[in-house]
Amino acid sequence: MISIVIPVFNEENNIGKLLEHLFENSSSKNISEILVIDGGSTDSSQQIIKKVISVTSSAVERSQKKGLDCARPDIVLLNSPKGRAKQMNFGAKHATGTILYFLHADSFPPKNFDELIINEVNKGHLAGCFRMQFDSNYWWLRLASWLTKFCWRACRGGDQSQFITKDLFNDIGGFDENYIVYEDNILINELFARKQFVVIQEKIYSSARLYEKHGVWKLQYHFLVIYFKKWFGASAEDIFKYYKKYIA
């Protein structure tokens, strides 16, 4: 079964919609739980999550009283120190499923994503992601989205989500918590080195909000600089300093 791990920090505009999307596009028989790991949100993220938990619990209870099958996976809200790597590792420690599925709060996976993931694992593909589509019609972002169909390391990123068996995740040692940013790519690099990565061709839809905030070309330039900084041996601290100065 799959444990979904969602790191959040001030995601009041997305988290409620994402949780409903997960319910509507998966089967409870395949999902152990949905772990939402909050890194100290100061907006209404936690209140929204708690409301979804309460409403879901009440709906399931009413259905059971009527003899109807309305099973939904449990949502577990946990608090962790801020930092996606720390939050996702914390969630993984509390996961009961044999497959971990790491998902950003502004990324919406395809219908039956759970079945698609399980099918790949059953084929022996122990880690991978979905092909990604930005919610933007800007030509460069459409091209960048199209390129994610290829299993190339340079086209990978956390907004495509990440599934991995818990055994493999633990063998690698989880996400490197030295990386405040770029943590997804560090794990992905290790998976490519082990030849343990597959791209599922169904699309996950992800927000282009960072591009809208900074401008497409400006942000793409900074991401490219970060990529080459890591390629040429920059430390996690150096990468974070650059990110904090130009993107955060």
Residue ranges and their predicted role:
Residues 1-3, 33, 186:
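Cell-envelope/extracellular polymer assembly enzymes that use nucleotide-activated donors
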Residues 11-26:
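Short, well-formed alpha-helical segments that are part of the catalytic scaffolds
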Residues 21, 38-46, 107-108:
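A conserved acidic beta->alpha catalytic loop
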Residues 32, 46-56, 73-94:
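Conserved donor nucleotide-binding strand/loop of the catalytic core
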Residues 100:
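Short aromatic/hydrophobic "clamp" motif used to bind/position activated sugar donors
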Residues 111-139:
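Conserved donor NDP-sugar-binding/catalytic core segment of glycosyltransferases
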Residues 181-187:
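Acidic donor-binding loop at a coil-to-helix junction in glycosyltransferase catalytic cores
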Residues 193-248:
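Hydrophobic helical membrane-anchoring modules
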